Every structure is written in C-alpha cells, then in structure tokens.
Amino acid sequence: MTLLEKTRKLNRILQKTGIQPVDFMEMASILKEVIEANVYILSRKGKVLGYSALKDYGDEIFAKDKAIPEEYNDRLLRVTETLANDKGKLFKEEKALADLIVTVVPINGGGDRLGTLLLIRSTKEFTDDDLIIAEYGATVVGLEILRAKNEEIEEEARKRAVVQMALATLSYSELQAIKNIFEELKGKEGLLVASKIADKVGITRSVIVNALRKFESAGIIESRSLGMKGTHIRVLNEKLLEELEKMKRD
C-alpha cells in the first residue's frame, strides 16, 4: 500500500467528523492495518480510547483495565514530540516490552496535550512513511477530541442557561420553595412531602406545585406522585444544584 493510499484510508475517517463521532477503535484498527503495528490511542489521563492489536507481543498492559498505569502515562506525557523506535528504554521495568520497538506520537490540539498515540512492533523499525501516517492519525484524533470537548462545553452552557431561565420565571415564594425542596432532598433525587415544606417556609402547597411544574416543563426535573407518601423528585439537569449552591453563597 502506497503512502497516498494509506493517507486516503485515514481521510475517509476524517470526512465523517462533524457528521458522526469518530470511532477510536475503528481509527486504531485502520492505523494498525496501514502501519502494521499494535496501536493504542490514549487520553491525556491514560485512558485507552481505542486499540487494535496486529499480534500478541505481550503488551496487554496497555489494554488492561482500559487505562495504563499512571507512572507510564506520566512518562508518555513527558514526550513532547514524536519519539521513534524506542527499544526498551521507555518501559524498561516491563520485561515483556524490553525487546519491542515503541513509537510515541503526542496528540495535541488547541495548544494543549490531549493524549498519546502509541505504536508497538516486535522487529522492523518504523519508517519515515510510518511516522507521517502516525502523525497524521494523531492530528485526526486530536481534532475529534477537540470537537467532543467543544460539544461538551456547549451542552454545559445550554443546560446552565435552561436552569437560569427557569429560575428567572419563579416568583419570590416559588424560589424559596425550590431552595427548601432541594435542601431537604440533599442530592439528585428523593421524596418530597409538600406539606412539610409549606409549613417550614410559610407558603401554600399550591406555590410548591407551581414551582415544580415550571421546572418539570423546562425538563430540569421529573416528579412522580406516591400518594400519601409524597412526591418522588429526580433532577435531570445537574446544573440546577450548582446554581442553587451558587445562590446560597451569594
């Protein structure tokens, strides 16, 4: 397979980005095929995002428990540019790895270290063509990690905005009711006895019901009546608890 053909294989994954999330296991599998090595895609914290083994070289330590040992990950993070064809130096304590050829490619994006691409072979050293493909693959992985992070940030902002808008619709009495309800629950779900809250705050049960309805219609909570026992409440948007805690501090 020529360098161009190998690059085109990776391009097919890149073309999916934005339409559907990149499958890191698929990415590792394609890199394994084009580079002919065991491939591990690691997050910054050492979590195994994807891996694919060409042969059993005794390097299962990198797939075990879906994360590599912290000490090893720290060593990988200290590699700031491609380290090619390491032989028994990086992981010298591991006898199984002593005779293997290891290449480490940092995954960077947005000025940050996002993870590590690890390539392992038993004999033949990695060529310049292999390293070009590996670094290109690391770039594709970095772009996908950044995209996922941006989506997560956007989703967090959306959830917070929904909570803030819902809180803004509450009357003073309803806000006091909500504050007391979640102080009473002490967590993301629990049983609410409306009459108990009403007596404590000095409001009517209808105020509590209205406040809960507003939050339920906003998709922030769900509630289920248990008759005489009370109402079971579960928080669907965890930003609610954060905003209430912030109000308490302010």
From Swiss-Prot:
It is found in: Cytoplasm. Residues 1-146 are annotated as: GAF domain. GO terms for biological process: negative regulation of DNA-templated transcription. InterPro entries: CodY, GAF-like_dom_sf, GTP_trans_reg_CodY_C, Transc_reg_CodY_N, WH-like_DNA-bd_sf, WH_DNA-bd_sf. One of its GO terms (molecular function) is DNA-binding transcription factor activity. Keywords: Cytoplasm, DNA-binding, Repressor, Transcription, Transcription regulation. Signal peptide: none annotated. The keyword Transmembrane helix does not apply. Residues 194-213 bind DNA. GO terms for cellular component: cytoplasm. It holds the Pfam family HTH_CodY. The keyword DNA-binding applies. HAMAP family: HTH_type_CodY (MF_00621). DNA-binding global transcriptional regulator which is involved in the adaptive response to starvation and acts by directly or indirectly controlling the expression of numerous genes in response to nutrient availability. During rapid exponential growth, CodY is highly active and represses genes whose products allow adaptation to nutrient depletion. Belongs to the CodY family. This is Global transcriptional regulator CodY.
